[in-house]
UniProtKB/Swiss-Prot annotation:
Prevents the cell division inhibition by proteins MinC and MinD at internal division sites while permitting inhibition at polar sites. This ensures cell division at the proper site by restricting the formation of a division septum at the midpoint of the long axis of the cell. InterPro entries: MinE, MinE_sf. GO terms for biological process: division septum site selection; regulation of division septum assembly. This is Cell division topological specificity factor. Keywords: Cell cycle, Cell division.
Length: 91
């Protein structure tokens, strides 16, 4: 049976992995004392600054997350940019 699991790959229990990720998120949030309100304000501040340099950012779609890396914790900001066809220049 282990041969078949190795051949086809056995998926990890998704609920256990989800619980692990949630626990890590809680621990990281607790370590840095960042409340949801502070994260929302950080997201708004990032959007404001980035719009000065990149007017095509989609501020509503910005995602800011804290995660645990191998050597250190990470603050990650995903900032979607509208393509030129999606956002015509102002004239």
């Amino acid at each position: 049976m282990s041969f078949l699991n190795g051949l086809f790959g056995r998926k990890r229990d998704s609920s256990a992995e989800l619980a692990k990720q949630r626990l890590l998120t809680v621990l990281i949030d607790d370590r840095y004392k960042l409340t949801p309100e502070m994260m929302a304000q950080m997201k708004a501040d990032l959007a404001e600054v980035l719009k000065r340099y990149l007017p095509a950012i989609d501020a509503e779609q910005i995602e800011v997350t804290l995660s645990r890396g191998e050597a250190h914790d990470l603050l990650k900001a995903d900032v979607p940019l509208r393509r030129a066809t999606d956002h015509p220049p102002n004239r």
